[in-house]
Amino acid sequence: FADCNYFPYVAVAVRSIVETASSENAYDVLVFTDADVRTSIRERLLDVTRGCSNVSLRLVVLEKTDLAPISGLFVGGLSAMTYGRLLLPSLLANYRRAIYLDVDIVVREDLAHLFGVDLKGNLLGAVKDEGVIRFPFPPQWREDILRECPDFDFGPYVNAGVLLMNLEGIRREKSMVRALELAVRNRFILCDQDALNIAFVHRLFLLPVQWNQCTKALPIEPSTGSPDVLGVHRGIVHFTEVKPWRDLRRNTLAWMWWDVASRTSYYRDFLLMAERTNRLVRAKVCDLLKLWIVTRADNRLARHKCPSFLFAAHLSKWRNKLVEKGLLAE
């Protein structure tokens, strides 16, 4: 689910699917969007799968009637399309099983391996969200969930960025209808993710951590004890914290995303965007440092009654340091 502004990131995600796809399988990739797309934008995105006969990429434009069940829901600063996954059982009425993927991911292993996982009779397969469980969240988060489900166990709370869905079973048991009802009458901090965890509380299958390696949980070894967490093998990397296209330095796995991005027609756009972001960050850091320098110098003047020429020399010294670090132009 994405609007036109997210198509460049969709392209990277789809490209990673193409590059890990097996020639023995056929892959049907659907991108749902909430507005009609100009031909030029559509063609640029579809170019990602050009020459790959076993990967089909289709854009599905949703009408207002399709989105009516999620219109007006609390989004907490996110796009309303975040609730789109709750509509999948009805939108994919002719499908028995599907994989849902967030946009901010890179696929590192053939998705056919995930698609074939036995859910053991459950309706939804997902990976435990170590980042949410281990990191401090406001008490309101737990209170909201427990109000709807008093015996809720937060131990197996899952991340909704990668979902293996038993669509046939979900439609039969109306589990997604329940999730929608929960989302409508609550303002959950984590929106539809909280609603999904409650609605599927007894019908969840925990997938191996490799299928949704959230970057927020990287410093933490999941309770599964899987060696894949900081190792080489990662089925899907999910950039849940700092997005790689925004800050490469603060993301240890950003290179994986940029490696795939370099083989899309959006690569130059990403580079220009990163350069603009870098300039803004450097300008902000420079302003903060200059403010700190002036404040520090003012304090010294007040304490030691320094002559003005010493004050000027002090600023000059720090200015030179800023230039050396590339934070200030000469």
Task: Give short role names for the model-derived ranges.
Residues 2, 6, 160, 165-330:
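A glycosyltransferase accessory/donor-loop signature
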Residues 16-25:
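Short, acidic, metal-binding catalytic loop of nucleotide-sugar glycosyltransferases
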Residues 27-35, 126-128:
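Short internal beta-strands
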Residues 42, 46-91:
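Active-site-proximal specificity loops/subdomain of glycosyltransferases
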Residues 59-61, 65, 81-137, 164-165:
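GT-A fold catalytic core of metal-dependent nucleotide-sugar glycosyltransferases
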Residues 116-179:
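Conserved catalytic core of nucleotide-sugar-dependent glycosyltransferases
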